[in-house]
UniProtKB/Swiss-Prot annotation:
The keyword Endoplasmic reticulum does not apply. The gene is secA2. PROSITE patterns: SECA_MOTOR_DEAD (PS51196). HAMAP family: SecA. It comes from the Bacteria. One of its GO terms (molecular function) is ATP binding. ATP binds at Q84, G102, E103, G104, K105, T106, D496. It is a peripheral membrane protein. It is found in: Cell membrane; Cytoplasm. This is Protein translocase subunit SecA 2. Keywords: ATP-binding, Cell membrane, Cytoplasm, Membrane, Nucleotide-binding, Protein transport, Translocase, Translocation, Transport. One of its GO terms (cellular component) is cytosol. The lineage of its organism: Bacteria, Bacillati, Bacillota, Bacilli, Bacillales. GO terms for biological process: intracellular protein transmembrane transport; protein import; protein targeting; protein transport by the Sec complex. It catalyses: ATP + H2O + cellular proteinSide 1 = ADP + phosphate + cellular proteinSide 2. It comes from Staphylococcus aureus (strain Mu3 / ATCC 700698).
């Protein structure tokens, strides 16, 4: 139920937006009379007005939107309605436009994309999967090209990496890019691993529109995009520790808070571990690897559920997105947790790889100069949008009144009773010819009900978020007479269900939802599958005390729940009190789930701050190195002086043998100078002597180069090698640190403080190590030339 104040604030926002809509309508009347050539010419004119400073994007908006609107009609046969203009204005302002299913978000986005692309900077439409990005791009590309702009799909389905690099540069030179959040995130990470200026391809992240914005920057905000590197030293403890954990008893050996994904050993558990593994002190420095593996095994055993968080498929652990129900093939849990789950399932443990580069979606989109989003369920996440991203949500009115009937929840004692009643209702609906869409929380449940319906001679389509393109087609057909579709919550999302001939008279699409989801936004999205653009329809959610939401999140008194559960069926059927009580339990459990989700995202955001700041600083330094074009004229003495001062200050006693050893290890393999004249008690004298050796080695290296051009390449490569090797170690260390600190202190505020303190210390160590490796690399790296005359650098 909407609060009166919410409605008033939204109406005030709409009031100011409608003034702009009125100006767009005035311009729309004007441009209708333009010839095609005159309308196309406006794009050139707009660019010139922006370049000259006569106009800004804001002042151009009414006229530019009118031009894009008229072009849409001439090219696509679609004329954006006023509700779409409202959404388009909200998107340009960098906020969240709530637009209901079927209101034309794809067409709405074309206007702010066109306007912002006029600036010549990077403009992006980001959606959740390749199919939707490709579908929307192919539908809208003719419009942009007709208007004189270039548009491209942000990815190529070609395995050849060298081809992809060249193609990427071509893709990102276009005015408008249609891509996915995952593709863009990985491109950002790959771009910042480039070893030359020519290897970079990603332009400025200027303006972006995120489709299904709540799914991407709220539900998936914590999801890290990870590029893996070399294998870590593999632990052989996974299976052994799993056997130990199997002997432990909850509340005796360990304590667990499933709602917070927290688990830890109690004193008896610590004693049991010390006895089992024959260690004197489990928390000694020598036993930290063992403690880490025990914590991983506990989490894998009790906090990750098969067929809920993951399932075993073709000998692999395939993760499941709890919010969306979608499978995540190729995605792995970090810091050894994936391997612990493999051990739990009795599988061969895969190699745990180090992390080369990582970023969360939350921080990826904060890199944009401006971004906005579209969703049908923005209002329910408004406070979080504002707290995390400073975005307000504006609810655009629907073009036609919503006719869908959202029926009250149907309440049952047990899941078996619920399932019987639900199947009975589905059979009755199917007999009338109404199309039915049954939505389940898990793929396992969807497969079960699909089989049951087949056994009852009700043919059905099963959609469990495996084949996006195929499922989009199937979900689009779910509105035909007699259609029966069984799906998980995310299957076919982004595709409208249009009613077939005669279905409207039958009452439209009936959406049956097997249980409340962990988030009320998802419930609302599922109801919204029916009743698009004023169509009739209905939705109903079936609930019981056995539901996952209740078992996982309910904080109700267990005895009270058992008392409700034990009531006989006759009393239940006559008990409104029972219905109200169960609804209260479910609603409260869902609220707890949502609150924990918000807290988890806030916690993840806090942890991410250190690595985000460090990543920005490191990538800035990489870019400075890539911009070096006059290495021959650069003076690297200041860098070397810093490094040599570190060396002399770190040594307690400077001796001749130690200084000579340092020179061999860091400056020159051929050093043979007599050092008798050096006063090793004078640190500054040692620094001066080392600087002399550094300059001699640098001059020798320069002499070995064929040209200043190759010397420039040499300096860039050896410096990048120093930065990357140290940064890779730091990223991997921070991933391990986060897992360790969070586990040790159960996610409390002191865990965050501890993490940031250690992260800062390690960053300072890393910056010193980068300088040291730069000096070592520039002195001791060698350059040779292959048969084609191309330089090959050999690092020390």
């Amino acid at each position: 139920m909407k609060h009166k104040l919410d409605v008033t604030i939204n109406e005030l926002r709409l009031k100011s937006i409608r003034k702009i809509v009125k100006r767009i309508n005035t311009w729309s009347d004007e441009v209708k009379s333009y010839s095609d050539d005159a309308l196309k010419q406006k794009t050139i004119e707009f660019k010139e007005r922006l370049a000259s400073g006569v106009d800004t994007l804001d002042t151009l908006l009414p006229e530019a939107y009118a031009v894009a609107r008229e072009a849409s009609w001439r090219v696509l046969g679609m004329y954006p309605k006023e509700v779409q203009l409202i959404g388009a204005i909200v998107l340009h302002e960098g906020n969240i436009a709530e637009m209901q299913t079927g209101e034309g978000k794809t067409l709405t986005a074309t206007m702010p994309l066109y306007l912002n692309a006029l600036s010549g900077k990077g403009t992006y439409l980001i959606t959740t999967n390749d199919y939707l990005a490709k579908r929307d791009f192919e539908e809208m590309q003719p419009l942009y090209e007709w208007l004189g702009l270039t548009a491209s799909l942000g990815f190529v389905d070609i395995v050849d990496y060298e081809y992809q690099k060249g193609e990427k540069r071509n893709i990102y030179e276009h005015d408008i890019i249609y891509t996915t959040n995952g593709r863009l995130g990985f491109d950002y990470l790959i771009d910042n691993l480039a070893d030359s200026a020519e290897g970079k391809f990603l332009p400025q992240l200027n303006y972006g529109i995120i489709d299904e914005v709540d799914s991407i920057i709220l539900d998936a905000a914590q999801t890290p995009l990870v590029i893996s590197g070399a294998p870590r030293l593999q632990s052989n403890l996974f299976h052994i520790v799993k056997e130990f954990v199997d002997t432990l008893i909850e509340d005796v050996h360990f304590k667990m808070k499933k709602t917070k994904k927290e688990i830890w050993l109690l004193n008896q558990g610590i004693e049991a571990a010390q006895s089992y593994f024959n260690v004197e002190d489990l928390y000694s420095e020598q036993a930290m690897v063992l403690v880490r593996n025990i914590n991983l095994a506990l989490r894998a055993q009790y906090l990750f559920e098969s067929n809920v968080d993951y399932f075993v498929y073709n000998g692999d652990i395939v993760l499941i997105d709890r919010i969306t129900g979608r499978m995540l093939p190729g995605t792995k849990l970090q810091a050894g947790l994936h391997q612990a789950i493999e051990a739990k399932e009795g599988m061969e443990v895969s190699t745990d790889k180090s992390v080369m580069a990582t970023i969360t979606f939350q921080n990826l989109f904060k890199l944009f100069e401006s971004f906005s989003g579209m969703t049908a369920t923005g209002k329910l996440g408004e406070s979080e949008f504002f707290d995390l991203y400073s975005k307000i949500v504006v609810q655009a009115p629907t073009d036609k009144a919503i006719q869908r009937i959202d029926e009250p929840d149907k309440v049952f004692r047990s899941v078996d009773e619920k399932n019987i009643a639900m199947i009975h209702d589905i059979v009755e609906l199917h007999e009338t010819g109404r199309p039915v869409l049954l939505i389940t929380r898990t793929a396992e449940a969807a497969e079960y009900f699909s089989k049951v319906l087949f056994q009852m001679d009700i043919p059905n389509n099963l959609l469990i978020a495996q084949n996006v393109a195929k499922e989009a087609q199937m979900i689009a057909e779910a509105g035909q007479i007699g259609s029966m579709t069984v799906a998980t919550s995310m299957a076919g999302r982004g595709t409208d269900i249009k009613l077939g001939e005669g279905v409207e008279a039958l009452g439209g699409l009936a959406v049956i939802i097997h249980e409340h989801m962990e988030n009320s936004r998802v419930d609302r999205q599922l109801r919204g599958r029916s009743g698009r653009q004023g169509d009739p329809g209905s939705s109903c959610i079936y609930i019981s005390l056995d539901d996952y939401l209740v078992k996982r999140w309910s904080d109700s008194n267990l005895a009270e729940n058992n008392q409700l559960y034990s009531l006989d069926a006759q009393r239940l059927s006559q008990s409104n009190l029972f219905n109200r009580k169960v609804k209260q339990i479910v609603v409260k459990a869902q609220r707890i789930s949502e609150e924990q989700g918000v807290k988890a995202r806030e916690m993840a955001n806090e942890f991410e701050k250190s690595i985000s700041i460090q990543r920005d600083l490191v990538y800035e330094e990489r870019n400075r190195v890539l911009e070096i074009d006059d290495a021959e004229n650069r003076d690297f003495k200041a860098l070397a002086k810093d490094v040599f001062e570190m060396f002399v200050n770190e040594e307690k006693v400077l001796t001749k043998s130690r200084v000579v050893e340092y020179i061999y290890q860091n400056l020159s393999f051929q050093f043979n100078k007599d050092v008798a004249c050096v006063n090793f008690k004078d640190k500054q004298a040692v620094v001066t002597f080392l600087l002399e050796q550094f300059e001699k080695q640098l001059a020798l290296n320069r002499k070995n180069m064929q040209s200043a051009y190759y010397y420039n390449i040499f300096v860039q490569k050896v410096f990048l090698k120093a930065i990357d090797s140290c940064w890779l170690e730091q990223v991997d260390y921070l991933q391990q640190l986060k897992a360790s600190v969070n586990q040790r202190q159960n996610g409390q505020r002191n865990a965050i403080f501890e993490y940031h303190r250690v992260a800062l210390d390690s960053f300072e160590v890393m910056t010193r190590n980068i300088k040291k490796r730069m000096v070592k690399n520039i002195c001791q790296s060698m350059i040779t030339f292959d048969k084609e005359g191309m330089p090959v650098i050999h690092f020390p």
